[in-house]
Amino acid sequence: MKQSHIRNFAIIAHIDHGKSTLADQIMSLTQTVSAREQHAQLLDDMTVEQAHGVTVKARTVRNYYQADDGQEYEYNLIDTPGHVDFNYEVAKSLAATEGAILLVDATQGVQAQTIANYRIAKQRQLTLIPVLNKVDLPSADIDAALAQLNDLDSAFTPEQVLQISAKTGQGVPAVLEAIKQRLPAPQGDLHQPLKALVFDSLYDPYQGVIAYVRLIDGQLKSQQALCLMQGQQDFNGKAIGVFAPQMHPQESLSAGDVGYVVTGIKDPRKVRVGDTLTSVATPTQRPLAGYQPAKSMVFAGLYPKNNDYPALKEAVQKLNLNDPSFTYVEERSEALGVGFRCGFLGTFHLQIIRERLHDEYGVDVLTTAPNVTYHVTLTNGQQVIVNNPVQFPAFSLIKEVTEPFMKAEITMPADNLNAVLKLAEQHKGTLIDLANSGDLIVASLKIPLSEIAYHFFSELKSVSHGFASLSTAFMANEVSDLVKVEVDINYAPVDALTFIVHREDAPNMTQQLVANLKTTVPRQLYPTPVQARVEGKVIARVDVPPLRKNAAVNGEQHSTSKKAALLRRQSANKRRASKNTIKLPQSVFNAILSL
């Protein structure tokens, strides 16, 4: 295929605006998939994607389009996620393209991730095609959506915006033609040494690491001796090919193409996303810039339920290869044994990783409460970075603590402003700026990451009746008054339940926590005390009811000596029971998440 006939593009949009449905229509109209193979969200092949109805991993597929001028064009499409937790997936996918379709739901208008993805694309100087989806629905407000797009970018005039229904296929042929006319062809040089960007990867137990590559210069051939420049790893390409949407082997790939290389490398750590692939015989002199590594925002402990640590270790290594924004280091818990302290982009990302561990690797995990990174200055001037609440220093050693603050941009109708600002105030947010975008308002807030890592998104949807949308970006670390809450069950500290909270919130949160634990900690033969401590003082306590009655007050008439004997035996049994460790189910650790 001539390079002038190649188009590499992504579809970017807010969550649920119809990216995957449009991708399905493009594959159908270009006959990439047959009618028999066609089904909804064809590229969303993960179990978690089908369960949640969202795209988690970017997918690439090659299509061949017969244009109106009678010539055939190669369309390399990348379908990207829309959830705020997966911005990193969008950014690395856009690095492999020259343009993108900016998709907007006509019933929702421009939303937070529309704006965030638009900015990512503009930073990479990509050509954008604005497309309005779901115009066939009775609730579509086309004029308002067109006005919002024009406010976002003055180049998005009503004449430039394509109006479609991805579900019915209305207007999609015009999108295919616009891709050919408006998006630029790649500008690589076939005669230069091979230079290719590794923009994604997956692990196959038989073939090893399979790298997704975008060729910048040169040619790539099967069985060629290749080198990863940053990883300094040489290997022979076992096979190369393209996704259509399944893997289709090819004899060669040329500059501008998007495809895959079967590396045969069995160690997932040796192939990193963002690396430059080149030829051993004639290597390129300068590697590509690659990616800024994703910064983990939320941390949680993952421990194997059945003590199968080797299986968990192998699973997290392979997941890290496929999803570099997921990080891990080994840690040990007194209560749960050996596991990993893992970093995530958000709590939804954490949920997806848990489900992928179960679905793809058959590993069930216990998860501790998520937390953010704290920077602690000690009284001796030493700086300590804390990702695990257990490692939070004693209060007598601390001079000050800083935590990450985020810039949260909330896009909403004007009617929701008061309710949203009230919610932000409850979560220690302060208003920075208000701006208008058509008939929408964009509120910029400064808010602690720890306050939006849990239930803020769902509460925002609730108070705005589903109309508000959120995007976040890191601002700075600022000083906060924070304390460590430690939990004892049966007088034994449970380190996995330790968490860090603002001092003013500690009394209420600990009372709620011990009340939740009262119903989730397994009952024993004797009352089990559950208490929460802050700075060495118990500030909340409950007793988990026993399975049996108190022998001394069971309503029967006994002699004094008989009752004394019962009490002595019961007291001895209580002392023995206090030394027993209680096996804790996941519901105990979930008690923190519901605060």
Curated annotation (Swiss-Prot):
Work out whether the entry's keyword set contains S-adenosyl-L-methionine: no
Which keywords does this Swiss-Prot/TrEMBL entry list? Cell membrane, GTP-binding, Hydrolase, Membrane, Nucleotide-binding, Protein biosynthesis
Show the CDD domains listed in the entry. EF4_II, EF4_III, LepA, lepA_C
Taking the record's annotation, the residue ranges forming a coiled coil are none
Enzyme Commission code(s) on record: 3.6.5.n1
Q: Could you say which enzyme class this protein belongs to?
A: hydrolase
Q: Nucleotide-binding as a keyword?
A: yes
Cystines in this chain: none
Q: What is its main location?
A: membrane
Specify the superkingdom. Answer: Bacteria
Location(s), subcellular: Cell membrane
Supply the InterPro entries for this chain.
EF-4, EFG_III/V, EFG_V-like, LepA_C_sf, LepA_CTD, LepA_IV, P-loop_NTPase, Small_GTP-bd
Q: Which reaction does it catalyse?
A: GTP + H2O = GDP + phosphate + H(+)
Q: Which GO terms describe its molecular function?
A: GTP binding; GTPase activity; ribosome binding; translation elongation factor activity
Sites binding GTP sit at: D16, H17, G18, K19, S20, T21, N133, K134, V135, D136
Q: Name one Pfam family in it.
A: GTP_EFTU
Got a GO cellular component term for this one?
plasma membrane
Question: Ranges for the tr-type G domain?
Answer: 4-187
The record describes its membrane topology as: Peripheral membrane protein
Alphabetized PROSITE patterns for the sequence: G_TR_2
Q: Write out the GO biological process terms.
A: positive regulation of translation
Instruction: State its role.
Output: Required for accurate and efficient protein synthesis under certain stress conditions. May act as a fidelity factor of the translation reaction, by catalyzing a one-codon backward translocation of tRNAs on improperly translocated ribosomes. Back-translocation proceeds from a post-translocation (POST) complex to a pre-translocation (PRE) complex, thus giving elongation factor G a second chance to translocate the tRNAs correctly. Binds to ribosomes in a GTP-dependent manner.
UniProt lists the family membership as follows: Belongs to the TRAFAC class translation factor GTPase superfamily. Classic translation factor GTPase family. LepA subfamily.
Designated name of the protein: Elongation factor 4 2
Instruction: Give the species this sequence originates from.
Output: Lactiplantibacillus plantarum (strain ATCC BAA-793 / NCIMB 8826 / WCFS1) (Lactobacillus plantarum)
